[in-house]
Amino acid sequence: MKISVRNLEPTKVKLTVTVEPEELNPYLDAARKEIAKQVNVPGFRKGHVPGKIIDQRIGFAAVAGEAVNDAVPELYSKALDEKKIRPMAQPEFDVQDVPQSANDETKLKFTATVERRPDIELPEIDGLEIAISKPEVKDEDVDKRLETLRQRFGTLVGVDRPAAKGDFANIDLTAEIDGETVDSQEGVSYELGSNTMLDGLDEALDGLSAGEETTFEGTLEAGEHEGQKATVKVKVNSVKAEELPELNDEFASEASEFDTLDELKADIRKAAAQDAEGRQATEARDAFIAKLQEGLEIPVPKGVKANMVEEQLKGMTPDPEKATKEQKAQAEETVEKDLRDQMVLDALAEKLDVQVSQSDVFNFLASIAQQYGMDPNNFIQAIIKNGQLGSAVQEVGRSKGLLAGMRAVKFTADGEVVDLSAFLGEAAEDEESESVEAASAAAAVADELSAKDDAKDAE
C-alpha cells in the first residue's frame, strides 16, 4: 500500500492511498462469500457458490463495490497509523480507481480528506514548577454561608406596609396587546428584586400595598406573543416579609447536628476550607494546561470548530441563526479554548504513554450513567451502538494524562509546596502490559465489549 500525504492546511490533510492487487484480493474474496450467502444460483447450495461463478452470474462490479466499501475504511485507518495522523473529524472519501474484472491489474486508489490534530511540541514537565494561590477562608465567607443556612429556616409573615425589595408579593397579572388580553395569571408569588419575571415588574411593585394595582409596559418572554411589547396590569393581593431566626445555640441545634453556634461555625469554616482547596486544585489544573501551551501557536481545525460553535450557540439562544455578534464571539472563544485544551491533553497522553484499559472505560461510563440515574450496562451498550466509545476512550486518556502530568509537577503557593494528592490520587501500580494510546484504543475496547454483548445474545 502506497500512501502520500498532502497538507492542505495546518489542520487538514489529503491522503492518497494506492492499494496493490494482492492487498485487495482478501476483500474481494470476503465480498464473494458474503454475496454467496444472499443469492440463489441453480446447481449450488446457498453460501457455497464459487467465486468465479459469483463474478459471472452476479457481476464483478457488485463484488468490487462491496469489497471497496469494506476495504477503504480499514485501509484508511492503517494509513493514519502509519503516517501518525490523528483525525479530529470524519473523512471525505473519493474512490478514484477500481479494478473492473478479476484479471484487471488496475490498483484500487482512493483519497481521504480529513481534519487532523496539529503536531504539538510539549515542554518537558519533570521538574516544572507552577505557582498558584493559597486557599483562604475569610470570616465573611463563613458569615455568608451561615446567612444562607439561616434563610432556609426563615418564615414569611404578612406585613401591613408597601412592598419593598426582598418582600414576597402575591399578585395577579394581565397582559394586553392593542387592548386585547393575551395572557393572565392569578395568585403568583413573587420576590421583589429577583428579576425573574417580566422586565419592569420589580419597579412596578416597589411601594405598592395589598389591594393596590398599577400598569407598566413590558416585553413578553414566553408564549405565543414572546418578544412583543404589552401593557401589563399588576394587582397586589398581599405582601409578606421574610422573618429570620436569631443566630444562637437554639438555631444551631435546629438547623444542624451541633448543639452550639460556635460548633456550627467551626463546621462551616471546615467546609469552606475544603471548598477553597477544591478551587485551588482547579486553579492548579488550569495553570498546568496553560503552562503546556505557553509560547505555542496551536491552530484549530476549522470544520470541527464550526460544528462546535453551532452546538454552543444552540445552548445560548433558541435560534442560533439569530445569535448576536457578542454571542458568536463568546461561543468561538469558548470553543477555541476547549479545542486547544483537548488537543494538548491528547498530545500529553501520548507523550506520557498513557494506558487506557477496559476497566477505565467502564468506570468512566458507569460514573456518567450514575449521575443521570441510568443503568450502567444499558448506558454503555448505547454508547457502543451510537459509535461514541472512541470519544469516551479519548476523554479517559485525557483525564489520566492530566493527572499523571500534574503529579510530575511541583505546585507552590507563597513559596511553599502544595500537596494535591487528595485530588490527584496516586499513580496506578499495576497497569496493563500493553500501552494503548487514548486516541486509538476505542476499536479494541469496542470489539471486546461488543463480543461480550453478542455472546450474551447467543445464550
Swiss-Prot record:
Residues 166-245 form the PPIase FKBP-type domain. It is an enzyme of class 5 (isomerase). Its EC number is 5.2.1.8. The gene is tig. It is found in: Cytoplasm. It catalyses: [protein]-peptidylproline (omega=180) = [protein]-peptidylproline (omega=0). SUPFAM superfamilies: FKBP-like, Triger factor/SurA peptide-binding domain-like, Trigger factor ribosome-binding domain. This is Trigger factor. Consists of 3 domains; the N-terminus binds the ribosome, the middle domain has PPIase activity, while the C-terminus has intrinsic chaperone activity on its own. GO terms for biological process: 'de novo' cotranslational protein folding; cell division; chaperone-mediated protein folding; protein transport; protein unfolding. Belongs to the FKBP-type PPIase family. Tig subfamily. InterPro entries: PPIase_dom_sf, PPIase_FKBP_dom, Trig_fac, Trigger_fac_C, Trigger_fac_C_sf, Trigger_fac_ribosome-bd_bac, Trigger_fac_ribosome-bd_sf, Trigger_fact/SurA_dom_sf. GO terms for cellular component: cytoplasm. Involved in protein export. Acts as a chaperone by maintaining the newly synthesized protein in an open conformation. Functions as a peptidyl-prolyl cis-trans isomerase. GO terms for molecular function: peptidyl-prolyl cis-trans isomerase activity; protein folding chaperone; ribosome binding. Keywords: Cell cycle, Cell division, Chaperone, Cytoplasm, Isomerase, Rotamase. PANTHER family: TRIGGER FACTOR CHAPERONE AND PEPTIDYL-PROLYL CIS/TRANS ISOMERASE (PTHR30560), TRIGGER FACTOR-LIKE PROTEIN TIG, CHLOROPLASTIC (PTHR30560:SF3). The keyword RNA-binding does not apply.
